[in-house]
A protein has these predicted regions:
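N-terminal beta1-alpha1-beta2 submodule of the flavodoxin-like/Rossmannoid cofactor-binding fold
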Residues: 1-103, 158-198
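A short beta-to-alpha transition loop/helix N-cap that caps and shapes the active-site region
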Residues: 13, 122-123, 153
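Short, glycine-/small-residue-rich phosphate/pyrophosphate-handling segment
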Residues: 104-148, 166
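Short alpha-helical linear motifs
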Residues: 109-112, 153-155, 192
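Ligand-binding pocket scaffold of soluble enzyme catalytic domains
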Residues: 4-7, 115-118, 144-149, 154-158
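Amphipathic, positively biased hydrophobic alpha-helical segments used for protein targeting
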Residues: 91, 129-130, 150, 183
Length: 198
C-alpha cells in the first residue's frame, strides 16, 4: 500500500515536532510493507483557494489521486485549531469534490484517510472531527481508530516515547489493513456516485 502524508507544520522539518512524528509514521509503514511520501506544505510553492491552480501542489494532488491508497493529515495544535497549511490542502481538495459531483465519480472511494495531531494542549478531538468530516464527504473510508495524538514535545523525546510508538503501530496497521480491503473490493466500481441532493 502507498500513503501520502500532508505535513502542516509551521516550522521547517528539522525543527518540527509534527515532522518528527511523520517520520515515525513513515518508518512504521515501511516496517509493515507500505510506502509513504511526506509532503511538507511550508516547503512548496502553491496557491491558496478552491480553484485548479497550476503550481507545485497540483501535480502532488494528481499523483495522490492516481497512485496512492490513503491520505493522512498531520498538524500541530495552534490555539486549539489545525494549521493553516492543512486548511489550504482542504481548500484545494474542494475542486476535486466539485469535479466528482459534476462527473458523478468519486476517486477517493478507493482510499482511506487518517489524521495525526501533535501538541501538548487540548483540541485533539475537535481537529480529528473536522478532518474526518472532510474526508467522509470526499468519499474516503475512515478505518477504526485511524488517529494519532502525539503530546510529547522535542524530537528526542518523541523518538523515545513508547506509548506513542504503540499508537503509531496500531494506526499504521489499521490504515494498511483497510486500504488493502478497499483496494480488493473496489468500491469505486459499485458505490453510488450520483448525488441524491440534486
Amino acid at each position: 500500500m502507498r500513503f501520502m502524508i500532508f505535513n502542516g507544520s509551521l516550522k521547517k522539518s528539522e525543527l518540527s515536532n509534527t515532522y518528527a512524528v511523520c517520520e515515525l509514521v513513515a518508518a512504521e509503514f515501511k516496517k509493515q510493507g507500505s510506502e509513504t511520501r511526506i509532503v511538507t506544505m511550508n516547503e512548496i510553492n502553491y496557491e491558496c483557494g478552491t480553484n485548479d491552480y497550476n503550481d507545485e501542489l497540483k501535480p502532488i494532488i494528481l499523483d495522490f489521486l492516481k497512485n496512492y491508497n490513503g491520505m493522512i493529515f498531520a498538524t500541530p495544535i495552534w490555539w486549539g485549531l489545525h494549521s493553516g497549511y492543512i486548511s489550504s490542502v482542504i481548500e484545494r481538495f474542494d475542486y476535486i469534490d466539485s469535479w466528482s459531483r459534476d462527473n458523478k465519480f468519486y476517486p477517493n472511494y478507493n482510499k482511506v484517510f487518517g489524521s495525526v495531531v501533535s501538541g501538548g494542549g487540548d483540541g485533539f478531538q475537535h481537529i480529528h472531527g473536522n478532518f474526518l468530516n472532510f474526508a467522509t464527504q470526499l468519499g474516503f473510508t475512515i478505518p477504526p481508530r485511524a488517529t494519532v495524538e502525539a503530546k510529547t514535545q522535542g524530537k528526542e523525546n518523541i523518538i523515545k516515547d513508547a506509548e506513542l510508538a504503540q499508537e503509531i503501530e496500531r494506526f499504521c496497521r489499521q490504515m494498511t489493513v483497510y486500504a488493502a480491503l478497499i483496494k480488493g473490493g473496489n468500491p469505486s466500481q459499485f458505490a453510488q456516485h450520483q448525488q441524491t441532493d440534486k
